[in-house]
Amino acid sequence: MKDISRRRFVLGTGATVAAATLAGCNGNGNGNGNGNGNGEPDTPEGRADQFLTDNDALMYDGDITDETGQDEVVVVTGAGNNGFAFDPAAIRVDVGTTVTWEWTGDGGAHNVVSEPESDFEFESDRVDEEGFTFEQTFDDEGVALYVCTPHRAQGMYGAVIVE
């Protein structure tokens, strides 16, 4: 009788441990660490980072250049060794800031076009002229996600966080 009780005890303990282990694995989290459960970033920084990282944006190293407090900000268009980058690739600005993209003349003809997942819509002409500029004033909070369409495959992407 004593052996049966010990067996039942071991069996019962094992079942309890297994149930507790499975319960811990059965949570509704998605494992991405952002806590919103849908796999999408829930912060402007997260949206910009995911967009730039997923698209292998040139000159993006994970840093977002803080340009808050500035009325006007310049983003170099045609930056980098091959002229296929925006510099800086990611910036943070205040509502009301005007961002000016200025062409270097390197890397061929460029444009600046918002992507469908962007909170803003804008599109420049496709130009290869050094010194050409395109301006966009951001009057609302949000995230501008953009690309140079001729150089999408080369990783020419950028982001503006407006707060």
Curated annotation (Swiss-Prot):
Entry GO terms, CC: plasma membrane
Classification via PROSITE patterns: COPPER_BLUE
Residues the record lists as N-acetylcysteine modifications: C25
Domain of life: Archaea
Keywords on record: Acetylation, Cell membrane, Copper, Electron transport, Lipoprotein, Membrane, Metal-binding, Signal, Transport
Signal peptide (UniProt feature, chain positions): 1-24
Pfam families recorded: Copper-bind (PF00127)
A GO term, aspect molecular function: copper ion binding
Gly residues compositional bias, start-end: 26-38
Domain Plastocyanin-like span(s) in chain numbering: 48-163
Renumbered residue ranges of the record's region Disordered: 26-48
InterPro entries found in the cross-reference section: BlueCu_1 (IPR000923), BlueCu_1_BS (IPR028871), Cupredoxin (IPR008972), Halocyanin (IPR017533), TAT_signal (IPR006311)
Organism of derivation: Natronomonas pharaonis (Natronobacterium pharaonis)
Membrane topology: Lipid-anchor
Xref: PANTHER family: PLASTOCYANIN MAJOR ISOFORM, CHLOROPLASTIC-RELATED
Localisation per UniProt entry: Cell membrane
Identification of the protein by name: Halocyanin
Keyword Lipoprotein: yes
NCBIfam families: halo_cynanin
Lipid addition sites, S-archaeol cysteine: C25
Function: Electron donor. Binds one copper ion.
Residues engaged in binding Cu cation: H110, C148, H151, M156
